[in-house]
Amino acid sequence: MSTDTLVKRPTRSELIDRFHSKIRAGEPIIGGGAGTGLSAKSEEAGDIDLIVIYNSGRYRMAGRGSLAGLLAYGNANQIVVDMASEVLPVVKHTPVLAGVNGTDPFVVMPTFLRELKEIGFAGVQNFPTVGLIDGLFRQNLEETGMSYAQEVAMIAEAHNLDLLTTPYVFGPDDAVAMAKAGADILVCHMGLTTGGAIGAQSGKTMEDCVALINQCIKAAREIRDDIIILCHGGPIANPEDARFILGACPGCHGFYGASSMERLPTEEAIKSQTLAFKAIRRKPA
């Protein structure tokens, strides 16, 4: 048996204590999505606090838009299980969470969550999520048994299994529901990340985000004052954006990046490096 397999992973309560210690010290909690083992390894090298893997990570690092994760291009829950063997062995000490499709009608959720814990995941997040869907389509999903309430139930079940839970919320009502379900960290989702080659071109303004995040914070704190709040998505795409939000939302404890943590940096770095090589000039023959 290798030394790595003997490493004791921190418990949920130990992780929460760690995060609260950082908050008291004025340090932001920074989480990130990883669509490849290299992304996860690099994020850990940057001292990230938590890593989440889910189907959209694989899609975006394959050059497809993140919303591909909401469409029928693959089994989201099986993709996460497949990604585990790529990511978990190369992450040495950072908690890795699984994105779970809570509305999957082909999964016995308590059994699946126990399997994820046994594989080595420290916790879960609700992704893919119907929270990103609106209009009549969302209404019909809710009416036909594929609802956000099922995602809340999944988070509650994960909490009962002592898994760390970091669900996406999209408004105050979601924040209340997830806080009541026992969620440890709420991630206020501001929509698809804008910018880059395959990012959204339209979305909320920063001012819109400030108002909505503060509403979510207020609603969640009325249920539990110990809950941790992070921001994610929309126009919050780089460190300066996150700094602005944390300054304008004192109750927000940090940032969770997905496209902003692996896609945008990769796009920029590879393009820049390629252009630098292309700029080399040699004497004509």
Curated annotation (Swiss-Prot):
It comes from the Bacteria. This is Uncharacterized protein y4oV. PANTHER family: UPF0261 DOMAIN PROTEIN (AFU_ORTHOLOGUE AFUA_1G10120) (PTHR31862:SF1). The keyword Transport does not apply. It comes from Sinorhizobium fredii (strain NBRC 101917 / NGR234). Gene3D superfamilies: Aldolase class I, Single helix bin. GO terms for molecular function: catalytic activity. Keywords: Plasmid.
